[in-house]
Amino acid sequence: MSVSRRSFVASLGAGTAGLITAPLIRWHGHEALLAQGQPERRADRLLASAPGMIRVDSNENPNGPGQRALQAISNAFGHANRYPVKEEDDTLAAIAKARGVAQSNVILGCGSGELLRAAVMAFTTSDRALVAPEPTFEAPANFARFVQRPVVAPPVDAKLRLDLDAIVAASRGAGLIYFCNPNNPTATVHGGDEVASFVEAVNRASPETVILIDEAYHEYVADKSYRTAIPIAMANPHVVVTRTF
């Protein structure tokens, strides 16, 4: 996003910035409650200790962390009594350098999920909906409903691709569009030119609507037409790109 971290927090407003904490904290309990109430989750817990278990629905690495990662974790234990202020700055600087952006354009979260929830709180209201296709990664829509924000869910097309025209039509008056590219769980991809045209169409239809482009699966894309939307976000204050690692 071309605005700074300070501008993003300011967009929450003085009142909302104070109110954001309670819904975000309560949501963690809500997630646990949902998991307990779902039979497949209960079965998942029973099977979690089975030897050689591979849970492809969770995109987990069955081999676990690599040796270098384990060593880095072990080395860090000696500093666990300290607040990671310098480490946070170092991480921000490393991400900014790798992506070719200013450090002030990078925001860290506890997984991208925290940033998705913060975006819902920042950009949606009781009369400015979240637009999230169906199906897509469900966390933003689930959280929006939890905090009683309206959700509009345009269905994917016959090829399981996000229906860009339907999303543009639904964007009028919306606060936030959640655009997962590649899309989870349909594994469909929109090329760079398509995404650029889509952003322009939304800007024309609803100039104040923010578009959050989730690139969680960026590293796995083989489609040559695909491009990251980071350059679009750097040029457009109404576009945010999230990644996870």
What do these predicted regions represent?
Residues 111, 117, 135, 221-223:
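Short N-terminal helix/helix-N-cap motif within the alpha/beta-hydrolase-1
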Residues 24-82, 173:
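N-terminal "arm"/small-domain region of PLP-dependent enzymes with the aminotransferase-like
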Residues 1-16:
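N-terminal secretory signal peptides and thylakoid transit peptides that target proteins
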Residues 90-129:
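Phosphate-binding glycine-rich loop
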Residues 164-172, 188-211, 215-245:
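Active-site pre-lysine segment of PLP-dependent enzymes
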